[in-house]
């Protein structure tokens, strides 16, 4: 099922051509351009209080284009700022954390054209909206995906992997059950995993996950689900040990 906010294609047009995905790229590009213009309009029309944007300036853009696309367009715009424009280190660091593709031919069309102070304020509102969702990220991970074998561990799915409508902690936590991608030294990428919230079993790629969850952040509901999933294997291990002793 497609996202209600439309596709967000994060690779170059050249890559899209190679994989016969130009229609996806074209639609994503069109929406990115519309989003950038909507941000400019929201800033331009915002009621001013001491020259600051209204507290809900970003709301209409986020509701129409989604947080994921809005962050993508804003991050791209920060990276497109010339060296003579001094964005704060915090904003630059934030923009680096969001994958965008440098594009000298098409990127200028969805670069937000506004005063730096207003751009920073709009980014602040967008980040607040994102943070209010309470999603897991690298900060809650004890290990990365290339530190050790992750089979049998609870993995944190990257928000960028999920459709925005599925953004929730319940959809982020998966128990890795197998696949060559579990081994950081393995050549394969596939990881087979079970969703803790609903028991769905499916295949993902190693890069779809941020890392191994630090279990101090494991919610109570997830602890119960995890115990239920691990119980049969623990019982099998006990039975095997008993058989060995007999």
Language-model features, listed with the residues they occupy:
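Gram-negative host-targeted secretion-system effectors, predominantly Type III and Type IV
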Residues: 1-246
